[in-house]
């Protein structure tokens, strides 16, 4: 249940090329984040925690889309490989909390040029939820805009 009146911003997509010609992905490593939230109900304190590793979320979504994740860059498939970079790119106050914005880039392993990128924000019960939602919205926006 959300008491926020302001909607999340729609994902922003930049497309300089098509990712359909690529078969492999190499995802830059990211660190796990663990966050928690708590509340008092009827005089009792309840808490929950959530953990997320952004590269695992990205990998799961892209693998489901048919990409093959490589554990390292391989020279013999350079022309078919995208390097995937992730970063947190902002925060915005929204209602009683804030959103976390993420940006994901898809770089050609062969030319080191930006093929496409997406930026989206998420807001959940914890920062881990925010990040997971932002990544999902970002990639959903990218794949729903495929030509």
What are these regions (language model features)?
Residues 1-65, 147:
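A structural "domain/chain start" motif
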Residues 6, 117-119, 139:
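Secreted/luminal cysteine- and crosslink-motif detector
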């Amino acid at each position: 249940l959300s008491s926020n009146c302001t909607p999340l911003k729609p994902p922003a997509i930049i497309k300089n090329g098509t990712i359909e010609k690529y078969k492999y992905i190499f995802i830059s490593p990211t660190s796990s984040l663990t966050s928690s939230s708590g509340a008092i109900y009827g005089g009792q304190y309840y808490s929950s925690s959530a953990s997320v590793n952004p590269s695992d979320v990205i990998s799961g979504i892209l693998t489901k889309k048919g990409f093959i994740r490589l554990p390292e860059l391989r020279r013999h498939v350079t022309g078919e490989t995208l390097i995937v970079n992730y970063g947190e790119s902002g925060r915005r106050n929204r209602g009683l909390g804030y959103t976390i914005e993420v940006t994901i880039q898809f770089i050609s392993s062969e030319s080191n040029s930006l093929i496409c990128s997406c930026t989206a924000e998420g807001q959940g019960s914890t920062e881990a939820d925010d990040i997971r939602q932002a990544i999902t919205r970002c990639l959903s926006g990218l794949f729903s805009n495929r030509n």
